[in-house]
Regions:
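N-terminal secretory signal peptides that target proteins for export/translocation
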Residues: 1-10
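Unchanged
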Residues: 98-122, 127-194
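Short, basic, low-complexity termini and linkers enriched in Ser/Thr/Gly/Pro
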Residues: 12-15, 21, 25, 217-224
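N-terminal strand-loop-strand
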Residues: 46-92, 105, 120
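Polybasic "coupling" helices that flank or enter modular domains
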Residues: 194-224
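Bacterial signal peptide processing site
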Residues: 28-29
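Boundary at the C-terminal end of the N-terminal hydrophobic targeting segment
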Residues: 35-37
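Intrinsic-disorder-associated, low-complexity terminal segments enriched in Asp/Asn/His/Tyr and depleted
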Residues: 9, 40-43
Length: 224
């Protein structure tokens, strides 16, 4: 009986030793304990929460679309009436905030479609507007695109009350944000495209006849 007890005691001691060895081996092999695993999980969650909460302030980014439409005789520009603040009720170019998983051009095309239902085969990035006070909500940079398309029916959707084509001499006063400057710069840049007959201009003119192109050039004006 005593021999059996001693044997059992020796086995118990041996089991404890083996367990300790396994535990130590696990530590040396980098296997995390439960507490360490929980700490890693918390740290990961904190990192995800802080992903965009950097120490230094940083601006938001939007895109805007200056779209010129040709109806066969004249060139018009597409505007939307804003349905929310800031500048609620004012006219502006279709645009909005860039999403995390899209390029600037993808964002511009998405906003154009969401707010007006319009799609275009080609848009040209022409300027970034970065004045610190251009948006009363926060620091916002906007990347602007333009295109010339055949005028088609549009409809205000999403956060746009309505979408409408305006003749170049009938554009409403006091456009939202810095969009009056945006229109001026767009016309200056597109005039350069016309004067130099760039590949981008040729791309925009696909689908238009030579006669139509001449009318478009006359409407937009040759600016130095």
């Amino acid at each position: 009986m005593k021999r059996g007890v001693k044997r059992m005691n020796r086995l118990s001691v041996f089991g404890c030793v083996v367990g300790c060895v396994i535990q130590l081996a696990g530590c040396s092999m980098g296997v995390p304990s439960r507490a360490e695993a929980e700490e890693d999980s918390v740290n990961k969650m904190n990192m995800e929460e802080k992903m965009y909460a950097y120490k230094y302030p940083h601006p938001s980014v939007t895109t805007d679309n200056v779209i010129f439409g040709f109806d066969g005789n004249t060139v018009k520009v597409l505007l939307i009436e804003r349905g929310g603040e800031p500048y609620k009720g004012c006219w502006a170019f279709p645009g909005g905030f860039l999403e995390m998983d899209e390029s600037a051009e993808e964002g511009a095309r998405r906003e154009l479609m969401e707010e007006t239902g319009l799609t275009t085969p080609f848009v040209k990035q022409f300027h970034a507007f970065t004045a610190p006070d251009r948006d009363p909500r926060e620091r916002v940079l906007t990347i602007a695109y333009y295109s010339v398309v055949r005028l088609s029916e549009v409809k205000g959707m999403d956060d746009a009350r309505q979408a409408k084509w305006f003749a170049l001499d009938e554009i409403p006063e006091n456009l939202a944000f810095d969009h009056e400057e945006m229109l001026r710069v767009a016309r200056e840049e597109i005039s350069k495209e016309i004067r130099l007959n760039t590949k981008d201009w040729q791309e925009m003119m696909k689908g238009f006849s030579k006669e139509e192109e001449e009318k478009i050039v006359s409407e937009l004006g040759m600016r130095n």
